[in-house]
Amino acid sequence: MEIVKKINLIDDEFSSAEANEILMDLYNKNINFNKIQNFSSQIRFGEDDEKALNRIAQLKESVSSIAEILEEAKAQNKKLKIKSFIEIEYED
């Protein structure tokens, strides 16, 4: 697929506390979105949304990895450079 747009979401340096707030908020919102998708599937179809459940598991794994990095940065009194981009493509 051809990338329609690439948007710079985050590109800055943060303390571990700031990085924690930004990243955990992003991940928690995404996890909650997928929980709602799964709940909707349960109500409408009487079954789990496997795609949403898999995504939740992936996101929770990422949260654990990020938490380790943030703790290490805090312990070493280091700032974190974070870059994040969103790529938007058309799907058939």
Regions found by a protein language model. Name each.
Residues 42, 49, 67-70, 74, ...:
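Coiled-coil heptad-register positions
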Residues 25, 62, 69, 73:
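Residues that form generic nucleotide/phosphate-binding pockets
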Residues 3-37:
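N-terminal acidic leader/helix
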